[in-house]
């Protein structure tokens, strides 16, 4: 089941989320916005199982990576039945 994965620009490029993902949804891509010169990217969200291990692994205080489960996205859009 695909979930929405959002990467925020608060990412510090540490790769913790990439290593924590059991389904390889995340990868690092070049980015000049942080010291590490890389940022997490989520090119394979269709493989996301919603375990949120990437969120747990994120060392920043403001969660640079967030997983929105399918029902959370639907509810926030006012489409829940």
UniProtKB/Swiss-Prot annotation:
Binding of [4Fe-4S] cluster 1 occurs at 11, 14, 17, 58
| Keyword set includes Nuclease | no
Topology versus the membrane, per the UniProt entry? Peripheral membrane protein
E.C. numbers: 1.97.1.12
Which Pfam families does the annotation name? Fer4_7
Please write the reaction equations for the catalytic activity of this protein.
reduced [plastocyanin] + hnu + oxidized [2Fe-2S]-[ferredoxin] = oxidized [plastocyanin] + reduced [2Fe-2S]-[ferredoxin]
Q: Where found?
A: Plastid, Chloroplast thylakoid membrane
**Broad EC category:** oxidoreductase
Main subcellular location: plastid
Q: Which InterPro entries match?
A: 4Fe4S_Fe-S-bd, 4Fe4S_Fe_S_CS, PSI_iron-sulfur_center, PSI_PsaC
Q: Where does [4Fe-4S] cluster 2 bind?
A: 21, 48, 51, 54
The Swiss-Prot or TrEMBL record annotates one GO molecular function as: oxidoreductase activity
What residue stretches are annotated with the 4Fe-4S ferredoxin-type domain?
2-31, 39-68
Q: Which cofactor does it need?
A: [4Fe-4S] cluster
Please share the entry's free-text remark on the cofactor: Binds 2 [4Fe-4S] clusters. Cluster 2 is most probably the spectroscopically characterized electron acceptor FA and cluster 1 is most probably FB.
Q: Tell me the keywords, alphabetical order.
A: 4Fe-4S, Chloroplast, Electron transport, Iron, Iron-sulfur, Membrane, Metal-binding, Oxidoreductase, Photosynthesis, Photosystem I, Plastid, Repeat, Thylakoid, Transport
Cross-referenced PANTHER family, in alphabetical order? PHOTOSYSTEM I IRON-SULFUR CENTER, PHOTOSYSTEM I IRON-SULFUR CENTER-RELATED
* Record HAMAP family: PSI_PsaC
- Please name the NCBIfam families in this protein's record: PS_I_psaC
Oligomeric form and interacting partners: The eukaryotic PSI reaction center is composed of at least 11 subunits.
Q: What does the record give as the function of this protein?
A: Apoprotein for the two 4Fe-4S centers FA and FB of photosystem I (PSI); essential for photochemical activity. FB is the terminal electron acceptor of PSI, donating electrons to ferredoxin. The C-terminus interacts with PsaA/B/D and helps assemble the protein into the PSI complex. Required for binding of PsaD and PsaE to PSI. PSI is a plastocyanin-ferredoxin oxidoreductase, converting photonic excitation into a charge separation, which transfers an electron from the donor P700 chlorophyll pair to the spectroscopically characterized acceptors A0, A1, FX, FA and FB in turn.
What is the recorded name of this protein?
A: Photosystem I iron-sulfur center
Source organism: Gnetum gnemon (Spanish joint-fir)
